[in-house]
């Protein structure tokens, strides 16, 4: 089940480039909508980061955990998994139009989009481009969402495209409040992301 785990998380943790800021969202919760808008504007300006952390995957017949490294440089990404989840290593790299997944001792897989790669390998349809937004604590701007704010006007939870995302804790890094512990709940798939180290960047200025 190693390849299945690798493809599931790697592709959920993917992006196909940053879309516009406009978001069709319903807002509720304890926070101030004006402060939330300012928070979104600040985080949307981040187009680069380096993340080190852990990821856990739970599905009806599969489960596992491992370490995560995610390098983002505008529309280029380099995501690596290792540890018990991989029992080895896997690396996912690409930019819009070209995605490659390399799995130790198992081969290389290519597609034009992460969605296509997931569909081809597993036959699953998931909003794999959304995590580039979700990992920053933002709803993806290209579809409707329902957000609940915490007392600090940051995301407490998010519902979008059949997924529920819970933000359990945040950490401040370089003036940005960024998610530290996140749980994603989809149909027959749960993902837990614990980010140990955030290094946010603004590259496109």
From Swiss-Prot:
Transmembrane segments: none annotated. A lipid is attached at residue 18 (S-diacylglycerol cysteine). It is found in: Cell outer membrane. One of its GO terms (biological process) is lipoprotein localization to outer membrane. One of its GO terms (cellular component) is cell outer membrane. Monomer. This is Outer-membrane lipoprotein LolB. It comes from Pseudomonas savastanoi pv. phaseolicola (strain 1448A / Race 6).
């Amino acid at each position: 089940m190693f390849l299945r785990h690798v493809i599931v998380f790697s592709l959920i943790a993917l992006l196909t480039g940053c879309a516009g800021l406009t978001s069709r969202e319903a807002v509720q919760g304890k926070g101030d909508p004006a402060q939330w808008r300012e928070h979104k504007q600040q985080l949307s300006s981040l187009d680069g980061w380096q993340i080190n952390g852990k990821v856990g995957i739970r599905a009806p017949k599969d489960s596992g955990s491992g370490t995560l490294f995610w390098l983002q440089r505008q529309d280029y990404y380099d995501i690596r998994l290792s540890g018990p989840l991989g029992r080895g290593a896997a690396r996912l790299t690409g930019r819009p139009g070209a995605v490659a997944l390399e799995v130790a001792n198992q081969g290389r897989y290519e597609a034009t989009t992460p969605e296509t790669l997931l569909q081809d390998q597993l036959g699953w349809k998931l909003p794999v481009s959304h995590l580039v937004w979700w990992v920053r604590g933002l709803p993806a701007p290209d579809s409707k969402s329902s957000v609940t704010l915490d007392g600090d006007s940051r995301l407490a939870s998010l519902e979008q495209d059949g997924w529920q995302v819970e933000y359990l804790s945040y950490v401040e890094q370089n003036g940005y409040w960024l998610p530290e512990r996140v749980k994603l709940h989809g149909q027959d798939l749960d993902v837990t992301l614990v980010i140990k180290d955030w290094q946010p960047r603004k590259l496109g200025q």
